[in-house]
């Protein structure tokens, strides 16, 4: 089958990019590819058998028109000016059989006009982390970009240490960012901002294209998608780590995996990025930061969208987030109905977990084994303050009994939303260290495991992290 690529971005937004081709690495070699995703995208298996090829930027497929996008943004709450694809190149937009499209974005593809002081490269460590994280999020059911392939090489890349240069092929329906809009707003070019909005609506919100109120309805949906995404992050214990406006997807996808982390111990103020000295992007601050970022996006639209309409959409954010979050947390607790005491029970559990630094993922997974008429719980042994747990657990069981649902039905629901496996940093680090020594076994094994996060396991993937694996420091360097 011949893959079809179109050039909408090139043709319709000529002032938003620079056309250029990737710069190949030295002795590049393909070490992993996503066979399931490739099959979904109808990519012939032969493309993965001919060396690095397109996956290493050595060749282009017919119809590709590579480019680097320009955008700007606020970083850590401060206007950073022009940014852009400093090491990534959008190779092309694949047209799928159902009419939808998928961007092919090659990360680590070399210098671009937007590289600033960088070298245009990515390292093996960061490409492995992003491939694992994006696939983990996908199989958890959370909107995200996807990873299609990883190429490593003999090219040295200088970060804190010398690391192997690598490339990641990332795919997504769109790479439109809040920062695209900010770029032209701060250049005082509101018509270019409107062109971006029209492009987004035309191709991703086409049902609104002919509506006279299209901008208000579109922005309201961007707000709702963002609120839903953040709610889902919070329920699985995911911390993004660098929620700058240029890392915010217009489509509500998880974008740009850098110093991310899943909670080990339940720590509301968890900071996964060791460069985040003020805790701006801490786990519990993510909902507020996302709203702040939406406010920055709204500002860019204010020249042609009524401020009252923008504020109305922004005002809906908290309720949408709380609705999604509440629904999912009730499912995680096994509640089939909504009762007035639900929030209190959840908050008391969180308080107990925070005091004892309970493992977030294991606690909810073990809670899924609860039998409503039995005071015994395997979770009890996880707590030091048994009296406090017993008090909470007795009230929790009484609450379960109100729903008049069998244990088996409730447990099935809970186990479908409480993963046994999340991508803990130590698991990623173990795969990285092996890969850097030339052994890709753990990389492939972990990728396979992450495809089934809700399945019971009895290996170390679902155990508590070892002492060395807790509080691993992760930086923005990639």
Curated annotation (Swiss-Prot):
A Pfam family that the UniProt record links to this protein: SelO
Cofactor(s) required, per the database record: Mg(2+); Mn(2+)
Reactions listed under catalytic activity: L-seryl-[protein] + ATP = 3-O-(5'-adenylyl)-L-seryl-[protein] + diphosphate; L-threonyl-[protein] + ATP = 3-O-(5'-adenylyl)-L-threonyl-[protein] + diphosphate; L-tyrosyl-[protein] + ATP = O-(5'-adenylyl)-L-tyrosyl-[protein] + diphosphate; L-histidyl-[protein] + UTP = N(tele)-(5'-uridylyl)-L-histidyl-[protein] + diphosphate
Binding locations of ATP: 84, 86-87, 107, 119-120, 170, 177, 256
Known EC number: 2.7.7.-, 2.7.7.108
Active site location: 246
Entry binding sites for Mg(2+): 247, 256
UniProt keyword terms in alphabetical order: ATP-binding, Magnesium, Manganese, Metal-binding, Nucleotide-binding, Nucleotidyltransferase, Transferase
A molecular function GO annotation: ATP binding
Coiled-coil regions listed: none
KW Nucleotide-binding (keyword) present: yes
Family under the similarity heading: Belongs to the SELO family.
Task performed by this protein: Nucleotidyltransferase involved in the post-translational modification of proteins. It can catalyze the addition of adenosine monophosphate (AMP) or uridine monophosphate (UMP) to a protein, resulting in modifications known as AMPylation and UMPylation.
Name under which the protein is recorded: Protein nucleotidyltransferase YdiU
Natural source organism: Escherichia coli O7:K1 (strain IAI39 / ExPEC)
């Amino acid at each position: 089958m011949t893959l079809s690529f179109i050039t909408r971005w090139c043709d319709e937004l000529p002032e938003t990019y620079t056309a250029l081709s990737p710069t190949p690495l030295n002795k590049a070699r393909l070490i992993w590819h996503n066979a399931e995703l490739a099959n979904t995208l109808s990519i012939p298996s032969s493309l993965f058998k001919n060396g690095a090829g397109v996956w290493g930027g050595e060749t282009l497929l017919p119809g590709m028109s590579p480019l680097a996008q320009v955008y700007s943004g606020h970083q850590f709450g401060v206007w950073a000016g022009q940014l852009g694809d400093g090491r990534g190149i959008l190779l092309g937009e694949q047209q799928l059989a159902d009419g939808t499209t998928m961007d092919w974005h090659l990360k680590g593809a070399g210098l671009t006009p937007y590289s600033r002081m960088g070298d245009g490269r990515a390292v093996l460590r960061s490409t492995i982390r992003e491939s694992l994280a994006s696939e983990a999020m996908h199989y958890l059911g959370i909107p995200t970009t996807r990873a299609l392939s990883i190429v490593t090489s003999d090219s040295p890349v200088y970060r804190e240490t010398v690391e192997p240069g690598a490339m990641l092929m990332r795919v997504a329906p769109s790479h439109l960012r809040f920062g695209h809009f900010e770029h032209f707003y701060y250049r005082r070019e509101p018509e270019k901002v409107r062109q971006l909005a029209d492009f987004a609506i035309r191709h991703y919100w086409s049902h609104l294209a002919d509506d006279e109120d299209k901008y208000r309805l579109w922005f309201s949906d961007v707000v709702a998608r963002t609120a839903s995404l953040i709610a889902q992050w919070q329920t699985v214990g995911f911390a993004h780590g660098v929620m700058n406006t240029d890392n915010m997807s217009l489509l509500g996808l998880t974008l740009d995996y850098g110093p991310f982390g899943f909670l080990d111990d339940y720590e509301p103020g968890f900071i996964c990025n060791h460069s985040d000295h003020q805790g701006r992007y801490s786990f519990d601050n993510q909902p507020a930061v996302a709203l702040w970022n939406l406010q920055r996006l709204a500002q860019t639209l204010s020249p042609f969208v009524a401020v009252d309409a923008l504020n109305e959409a922004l005002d809906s954010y908290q309720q949408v987030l709380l609705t999604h979050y509440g629904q999912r947390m009730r499912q995680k607790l096994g509640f089939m109905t909504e009762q007035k005491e639900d929030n209190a029970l959840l908050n008391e559990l969180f308080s107990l977990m925070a005091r004892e630094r309970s493992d977030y993922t294991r606690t909810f997974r073990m809670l899924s084994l609860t039998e409503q008429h039995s005071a015994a719980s395997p979770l009890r042994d996880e707590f030091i303050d048994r009296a406090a747990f017993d008090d909470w657990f007795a009230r929790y069981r009484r609450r379960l009994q109100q729903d008049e649902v069998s244990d088996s039905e409730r447990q099935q629901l809970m186990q479908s939303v409480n993963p046994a496996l999340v991508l803990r940093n130590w698991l990623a680090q173990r795969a990285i260290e092996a890969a850097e020594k030339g052994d890709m076994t753990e990389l492939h094994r972990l990728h396979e495991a992450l495809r089934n996060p809700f399945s019971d396991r009895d290996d170390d993937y679902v155990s508590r992290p070892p002492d060395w694996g807790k509080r691993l420091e992760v930086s923005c360097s990639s």
